[in-house]
Amino acid sequence: MRLWHRFVKFGFRRLYNEFAWTYNLVSRIVSRGNWHAWQRAALPELDGTRVLEIAFGTGNLLWDMTAEGYRCVGIDLSPQMARITARKFRQRGREAPICRARAQQLPFADGAFDSMVATFPDHFILDPPAQTEMARVLVPGGRLVVVDGGHILGGDPWTRLLNWAFTVTVSPRRSAGAGQQFSHDSFSVERRQVLNRRSRVGVLVAVRNEDELPGS
C-alpha cells in the first residue's frame, strides 16, 4: 500500500506541474462533467467580499468569484497552474490576482480576508501550522470553505469505476475526506452534503471563532 501511495503522489505531482495543461480535461472525465459544479458548491457559503483561494489550480473558481464581484486573491505552488490562470484572466481582460505561497506561510496580514476557499485540497488542509495560518488571516467570524469528497450518482459500471478510482487516488493523499478530519481550536466546523441531479459533494464550513486567537 505504501508503494501505491507513492505512485499516486508522484502522479498528482506531475498532473499539477508538467501536465497541468491536461488538468481540466482529466477532472471533467473523472467527475463525469461535475467538477466545476462541485467547485461552485463553495460559493453559497462565502461571507463578505475579501476571499482567498488556496491552491487555485487552473483558476476556474477564482475567475467565477472575481466575475461575481468578490475581491479575490489566489495562491498556488505550481508555476504551470499560475501560467494557465494568468493566461485565462488576460484573455478576459483582467490581471490574475495570484501569487506563489504555501498555506503554512501565508504572506498576508492578520484578518486580511472574510472568507477562504479550497476545493479538493491536498494534505496541507489537515496540517496544524497551515490551519493556524488560515485562522490568522481570517477575520473573527470569517469562513473557511472546503469542498471535498465528490461522488457520482448511478450504478452503471463506468460510474462505479470512477467512484472507486476517485476513492483510491484521493484517499492516499488525505486518508479520508478533509471534511471528516478537519479540526482546530480556532474553528467551529460544520459538514454538509450538496446534492444535484447527477452527483453529491461534501462541503465543510469552518467558522473562525471570535474569542480564539490562532496559536493561543
Report each predicted region and the residues it spans.
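C-terminal alpha-helical "lid/dimerization" subdomain adjacent to the S-adenosyl-L-methionine
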Residues: 10, 146-202
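A short acidic, Gly/Pro-enriched loop at the edge of an enzyme's catalytic core
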Residues: 104-116
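A short glycine-rich, Lys/Arg-flanked "PGG" loop and its adjoining helix->strand segment in the class I
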Residues: 129-140
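C-terminal lobe and adjacent flexible extensions of AdoMet/dcAdoMet transferase-like proteins
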Residues: 204-216
